[in-house]
Amino acid sequence: MTAPATNLMGTYLPAATFVRGRGSELFDDAGRRYLDFVSGLAVTSLGHAHPDVAEALCAQARTLWHVSNLYANELAPEVATTLDRLIGGGTAPAGGQVFFCNSGAEANECALKLARKWAGPGRHVVVSTWGSFHGRTLATLTATGQPAKHAPFEPLPEGFVHVPYDDLDAMAGALDGGDVAAVLVEPIQGEGGVVAPSSDYLPGLRRLCSERGVLLVCDEVQTGLGRTGRWFAFQAHHLRPDVVTVAKALGNGMPVGACWASAEVAAAFGPGDHATTFGGQPLAMSAARATLAVMERDDVCARARRAGERLAGALGSLPGVRSVRGKGLLLGAELERAAAAEVASSALGRGLLVNPVRADTVRLAPSLLVSDAEVDEGIALLGAAIGEVLAG
């Protein structure tokens, strides 16, 4: 047998090897500089190696890393209180409770279990949408509305139904059976192409769920914590979900996830119903506490709105870009032809990280602290890449 080139499983196709980061910049193993408009898939929202987060981690690492959830620590309740307030809009608490975990998939798994426990026997179905992405575990993969990702792992768990995104009539029909526990939805579909629904969609879902006694679960793993110009994307629609899942930006690169639920729904869980070894540990919570503190201090929501307007406007003026979708600093540039992978590759060669999320769409998710000069530099590099590819 021929020895593998690496002892890592072949689940990824890395395009570069990075060894250092600073703000919106990355440096590879040859010392070359790149401008990062991927942010680790909307994770490093404060940029790489943010000094406040780095200092918090170093200080905590000298004190206490981990004790398991057999015991309490001082940081987790504090971070939960901050999250609850931000879900309430930033000024007043939402009155819910938080379960900490390690990733977006784990946060969504928690939400799925909580929904089933809350709904009780006979009501176990979760309705999600085509084009969605909710994780890679078997349950969250099944909730994900992308059949190509399902095929290699069938048979999948039962109890999941998919309907078209932004279609209230289809959703109403799916809720008619009486066996539905929850609706799971992204306020903006990220992996599905940065697709924002019509303005009446989320309010319509809230109304349908309230009428049918079904939980509304908002997956804010990618859209949450300032990315779209609000603390959470659902807040643009003046509603309150029953459950909100959070991860990615919460630790600015440290693995941290969270599932928030209203007090009534959270009460369905009792001791032993759900658990995690690492979730909520002091080291991860120190990163989350520092990250949230910087986000509030530096008003990342306002910064995302302002920088997003600049970036979206410049994207829309680039030759070869048909349209720009998204909000704040979660944007998708739809190209005039299906060449997103080639454009991303050309951009990387020029020193810019973007990623293709559909055959014709490149996603941009820079740091929420990105400067005007960095936005302009990114646009110039992307424009050159698009011009090169579409001219070929």
Identify the residue ranges that each predicted region occupies.
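Conserved N-terminal phosphate-binding loop of PLP-dependent enzymes in the Aspartate aminotransferase
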Residues: M1-G392
